[in-house]
Structures are given as structure tokens and as C-alpha cells.
Amino acid sequence: MNTIATDLDGTIYLNNEIIPGVIESLLDLDKHNLKIIFITNNSSQAPMEISNKLEKLLFKDIDLDQIVTPLVILKQYLENKNMMIYVHGSDNLSNFVNSIANVTTNIDESQMVLIGRKEKYTQLEVNNIMSAYQNGCNIYALNKDLSLIHISEPTRR
């Protein structure tokens, strides 16, 4: 089976609305027996949340193996590692990482700092992360999409 991959934000949907023509295009791809993989660099939603959103918008079942996000890659990366992780990000990110790994709220106990989306950073938080790095801690960052355009309503043609 051949596979095609597509981005989500701005390609399949804008905010919570399907982009006109997407459903018809995906039905056409299904007719040609193409497996569709949905890719995003957004780490603010768990893969299950994205799958549920797509199912509601597309009116079809979406398997989790069709979803590729930074969290999917993170889960695979951490699969056989046993390390304490300090999460500097949203509650959603902390909850997801806590479901797949050992999370600590004490950065000094961590072997890995994971930086995700967080609306505001303090200088103390930045200093603590730098100190952890200088003490040998691995630092990993998920995207901060500075180019994402937020549109309140999809453009209709």
C-alpha cells in the first residue's frame, strides 16, 4: 500500500473547521487505496486528541498509527530509557510525558529537561534550565512555532 503524508494545521483544518475540499480529496485518496498519515509539529495535543478531532471533522475512523507528532517521536525515543524527566511546558505536555515516563518536579533530580510550549518564561526558569545543562543534563525542545498564523475564520472562496 502506498502512503501519503499531510500536515494538519492550515492543510486539513484551520482552528476547528475543515478546509473546503479536504473531505472530497481524502475520499479520492481512499479510492486509490492510499494510506494517509497526518503529521504536525504541534506538541500541545496528545495523539489521541488529534485522532478524535480528525474523526469529528472528517466523519471517519482515524487510527493512532496515522498520527505523527513530536509526542509520538518522544514516546518512541523514551521507550527503553529509564530517566527522570523535568517537563517545562503545558499541563497537557506534563500529563502526556507522565503517562510514558518518570517525571520529576525537581529539575536537580532530572537527567533530561523537556521544553515545550509555555506562554511565559521567567528568568529563574531559564537560569535553572541552563544550570541543569551545565551540570550534564540533556535538554530537548519541542517546537515553538513562531510562524503559525492564527485565523479566526477560514477564508471561503
State the predicted function of each range.
Residues N2-I18, F38:
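Asp-based phosphoryl-transfer active-site loop
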Residues A101-Q111:
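Short acidic low-complexity segments
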Residues T6, L26-L54, M84-G89, N138-S147:
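Substrate-recognition element of Asp-dependent hydrolases with the DxDx(T/V) motif
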Residues S147-R157:
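Residue-level detector of conserved catalytic or cofactor/ligand-binding positions
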Residues G21-N33, N128-N135:
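Catalytic-core regions built around general acid/base machinery
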Residues D63-L74, D108-S110, K144:
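A short, structured active-site edge motif that brings together acidic residues
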Residues Q76-I100:
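Short, charged N-terminal beta->alpha structural module
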Residues R117-E125:
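Active-site glycine- and acidic-residue-rich loops that bind
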